[in-house]
Amino acid sequence: IITATYRLLWTVLLMTPVIVFNRKFRKELIAADKKIVILCAISGIFLALHFTLWFESLKHTSVASSTAIVCTEVIWVALGFRMFLSGSISGKAWLSIFITIVGSLIIALADLSAGGNNLTGDIFSLAAAVFAAIYTLIGRFARESMTTTVYTYIVYFFCAISLCIALCISGLPFTGYGSSAIIVGLLLCLFSTLLGHSIFSWGLKFMSPAFISASKLCQPAVAAVFAFFLFNEI
């Protein structure tokens, strides 16, 4: 949760001058529909829950298992897109979803045999996937009337506040984790948030949210490779 908090605080810190000093974005934020702003705030809270549970899951299970299960987000996005936004899902997409479900079940069964602690991590990862799906679906709706910059700023702002509140509730201090934690937070802000989540948010206006979520399915393989070399996880 410390890493996620630093990541979002860095993001808000870097984006605030853009919003404040850019007349177009400033006017858009001031004139934004209050209902959409509230939705964006809710989206930010769910994003904070996603980060909190995903990072917590890594304490209980492997990077590969956690990332693979988090990627079941595509299932919940597809179902939500179909049920709540009247979207259409192709046969190939449903096939991909089925394969994702089977893969996740295999991981869960393997972790169940490995011990209850691993299964706890899997449950946290699954909850993180559901929260990420809600964040994505709200983004699809909000992006119809907002630019990427203003939408993501509101979401990240409320996400950062939510993470700070969670940090206070947990009793953990905000400081004292060394310069490495600050640097990692900055790097995650630059590459995972501004060049990751923000690009996905941009795409939500032009592409199906199910497709956006499916594009993240390469994460487990990449994460597994890094985990093998950095943490000797197999």
Q: Which sequence ranges carry the predicted segments?
A:
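Alpha-helical transmembrane segments of compact multi-pass small-molecule transporters, enriched
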Residues: 9-14, 69-83, 98-99, 158-162, ...
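Membrane-helix interface linkers and caps
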Residues: 17-42
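Transmembrane alpha-helical segments that form core, pore/gating elements
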Residues: 1, 12-15, 77-78, 97, ...
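Hydrophobic transmembrane alpha-helices of multi-pass small-molecule transport proteins
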Residues: 15, 41, 80, 89-111, ...
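Hydrophobic/aromatic residues within transmembrane alpha-helices
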Residues: 3, 7, 57, 69, ...
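A helix-boundary/kink motif common to multi-pass secondary transporters
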Residues: 1, 62-63, 88-89, 147-148, ...
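Loop-to-transmembrane alpha-helix entry segments
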Residues: 67-70, 83-106, 118-122, 178-179, ...
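Hydrophobic alpha-helical transmembrane segments of multi-pass membrane transport proteins
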Residues: 38-60, 80, 106, 123-138, ...
